[in-house]
Amino acid sequence: FCTSHAFCKRVMGIGRVMCGEDVKEFLEEYSFNLTKNYKMDNRRSLQSLVEDPYFQIIENAKTNCRSVDEERLSTILALRKNVTPLMLNSIAEAWEEYRLKSVPVIYSFADMINKFITEGTPPLIKVLIVDEAQDLAELNWQLVDKLSKTVETIYIAGDDDQAIYEWNGAKPQRFVDYAGEKIILNQSFRIPKKVHTIAENISKRIKVREEKEYKPREEEGTVTEVSSVNLLPLKEGEWLVLASCDYMLSDAAKGYGIRKFLIDNGFPFSHNHYRYIPHKMMSAMNAWEKLNIEGTITVGELGDLYNYLGKAHVKRGFITKVLNDENKGQQVNKQQIIDMYGLKEECLDEEWKEVFSKTIDIQRRAFIEKALANKEDLIGEPRVSISTIHQAKGGEAENVAVLLDLSPAQQEDFILKPDGLHRQFYVAITRALQNLYLVKAKN
């Protein structure tokens, strides 16, 4: 199993994938201005160059098989407000020339698929399985069409009620209209009865959809309305908290305080799949605790520790030496670590809060203390996940809380295209395995 672009990349032997550094060098040669100024010496800012609206629209135009002008007009106003048509066309034309003359040639995801469609030979495969077909854009469908000509059996799976990427070019009707035998899997193994009732009420409001029967599990489940995320019983259990936009998860200044609430209370969480307390941070702390209690750790554990100790506590050159040491399982004691691996002896008596004060910020140190006092597990997967609805697609949890707020752009879009919003909340609500909490909108 692989993504469509990964398949095309492998089959076509493509080696160079578009990255922020490529865009930086392109801008240095052509002197274009994007929608904002980026710090060219910052790794994260460099990567965000690829996500600038100009390059997003250019990539989406390829994915949706449209001109950049058509794509710009199909893009939500908030994303294209700083994009000028003349500049867009100039950048698109110059970028295509630049990427093709580069050695090796630079490929975006859409370029990889286009390369296979125009030049590739379908491999000899007997069965083709296409999943999440309701989210495929036109270019992906052209890839499916090409592969299907030489394949004996094709399975295309999807649910048009969960087509939440139409704004980005997905064509669920292509999936619904695809010729062949239709098999409806009408039994849910996730959704309990009370959650199913809410989901059905939403799906029936979708005007353009394939009618289908969909039965819930035997369990009743629960549906609860609350006026604030602070009233959610987040102290225990597995949770998935969903919102339409990312700022609704983290912008406390606008009254959206779920992230702050979790931090203040010491509840372990991930935000759009990124852990608030990374694995490496806990591995370093555990190695420090083990070294001070047991007196010995492995070289691998020492590497975890050195990742966070930094130069203040390790002599010059030894961090790289330890990280490159191939004998990860070798046991070393305190004295060996001081004599042979460069640990500064004076730091051994310090508590973890002191020794990691330069590498773990004060907010996270306070959070870790609260979480440990709560007897929370900071090693395993965080029991609370906060996410946008689009990021959580495919996920599930025993307890799901859905913030019912809409952004101004969504409110405006809902007037003309209500189906997209109905599908979005259908997806959100059907993540619940047992208990659904609906958090009333602030707006």
Predicted features and spans:
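Conserved P-loop NTPase-based nucleic-acid remodeling module centered on helicase motor cores
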Residues: 1-58, 263-266, 270-274
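Short, surface-exposed amphipathic charged segments that create phosphate/polyanion-binding patches used
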Residues: 12-22, 197-202, 282-290
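Short amphipathic alpha-helical segments that mediate assembly, nucleic-acid/protein binding
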Residues: 23-24, 42, 51-54, 68-75, ...
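Amphipathic alpha-helical "lid/sensor" segments that cap RecA-like P-loop NTPase cores
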Residues: 52-71, 238-258
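Flexible, charged surface loops at secondary-structure boundaries
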Residues: 121-125, 231-237, 396, 430-431
